[in-house]
């Protein structure tokens, strides 16, 4: 069952300006493993984090670095969502068991689309 859907679009030059204007922002938004990625990849990951928040109803108190979008390390190249802390607690409270994520960037725009899903126990074993 779909619990929520989220989408976000980031203007890459504007995002760059925000990171340059507020150096501490990079550490607040991204995990240590994400921080050294190219700017367009960071913008897409920020869009993903915004989309994840929207899929969960934009709960207050979410810590952005509690959501990690690593580089795909499996053969199909699909991005994955890893949660800890405040974001994981909210996902668990909503019964979210699976995330479907699509990232894209082209020119000055980065975008992310996410579907939050709750699967029944019998679906898990299938």
From Swiss-Prot:
One of its GO terms (biological process) is fatty acid biosynthetic process. InterPro entries: 4-PPantetheinyl_Trfase_dom, 4-PPantetheinyl_Trfase_dom_sf, ACPS, Ppantetheine-prot_Trfase_dom. Pfam families: ACPS. It is an enzyme of class 2 (transferase). It catalyses: apo-[ACP] + CoA = holo-[ACP] + adenosine 3',5'-bisphosphate + H(+). The gene is acpS. This is Holo-[acyl-carrier-protein] synthase. The lineage of its organism: Bacteria, Bacillati, Actinomycetota, Actinomycetes, Micrococcales. Transfers the 4'-phosphopantetheine moiety from coenzyme A to a Ser of acyl-carrier-protein. Its cofactor is Mg(2+). Belongs to the P-Pant transferase superfamily. AcpS family. It comes from the Bacteria. Mg(2+) binds at residues 8, 50. GO terms for molecular function: holo-[acyl-carrier-protein] synthase activity; magnesium ion binding. GO terms for cellular component: cytoplasm. Keywords: Cytoplasm, Fatty acid biosynthesis, Fatty acid metabolism, Lipid biosynthesis, Lipid metabolism, Magnesium, Metal-binding, Transferase. Its EC number is 2.7.8.7. It is found in: Cytoplasm.
